[in-house]
């Protein structure tokens, strides 16, 4: 199922900017690259940190306050609260983590390095595939219900029991028996 896919297969390479870049330039880059967030390398006294700036940060911390985006540095609005996950995290697990930490982006860390980002938007884009898979599952379950109510399954079940007990043909090999079972299921 789609939810079992590891985020490694759908993650994107994160965009990294210097903390002294203007919010205007970062917003322009985000629009050009069609991404809702960037990693920000901030040079702080005595240390360097990696933070995140999102489109929501720009709206809440700059635009709503009517600050000039070309004068505000991105490091002044970025946050050090990165939520990280390993590359083998499944999509279902990623959604749970996003909900738990109330975040729209997760950063994928491998061997201590940020190697990717997955956003809520990325997960929404694959939602049609999830819906399609769920529809297939529902149709399959409805088919089983129909077979059970029509008695077809019990007939197949008896045939499989006969095959297992060797009543069908004692000369059949294991491979032949498997093939017969598969044909019954189909």
UniProtKB/Swiss-Prot annotation:
Q: Does the keyword Repeat apply?
A: yes
Q: PROSITE patterns of this UniProt entry?
A: CBS (PS51371)
Tell me what this protein is called: Uncharacterized protein MJ0450
Pfam families found in the cross-reference section: CBS
**Key word Ribosomal protein present:** no
For this UniProt record, give its keywords in alphabetical order, as a comma-separated list: CBS domain, Repeat
Gene3D superfamilies the record matches: CBS-domain
Which stretches make up the CBS domain? 10-69, 77-133
């Amino acid at each position: 199922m789609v939810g079992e896919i590891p985020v490694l297969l759908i993650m994107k390479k994160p965009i990294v900017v210097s903390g002294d870049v203007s919010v205007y330039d970062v917003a322009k880059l985000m629009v050009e690259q069609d991404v809702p967030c960037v990693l920000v390398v901030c040079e702080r006294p005595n240390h360097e940190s990696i933070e995140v700036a999102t489109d929501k940060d720009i709206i809440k911390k700059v635009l709503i306050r009517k600050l000039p985006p070309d004068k505000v540095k991105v490091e002044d609005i970025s946050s050090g609260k990165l939520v990280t996950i390993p590359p083998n995290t499944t999509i279902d697990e990623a959604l749970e983590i996003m909900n738990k930490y109330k975040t729209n982006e997760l950063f994928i860390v491998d061997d201590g390095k940020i190697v990717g980002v997955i956003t809520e938007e990325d997960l929404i884009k694959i939602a049609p595939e999830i819906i399609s898979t769920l529809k297939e599952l529902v149709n399959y379950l409805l088919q089983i219900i129909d077979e059970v109510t029509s008695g077809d399954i019990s007939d197949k079940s008896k045939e499989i029991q006969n095959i297992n007990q060797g009543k069908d043909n004692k000369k059949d090999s294991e491979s032949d028996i498997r093939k017969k079972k598969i044909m019954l299921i189909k």
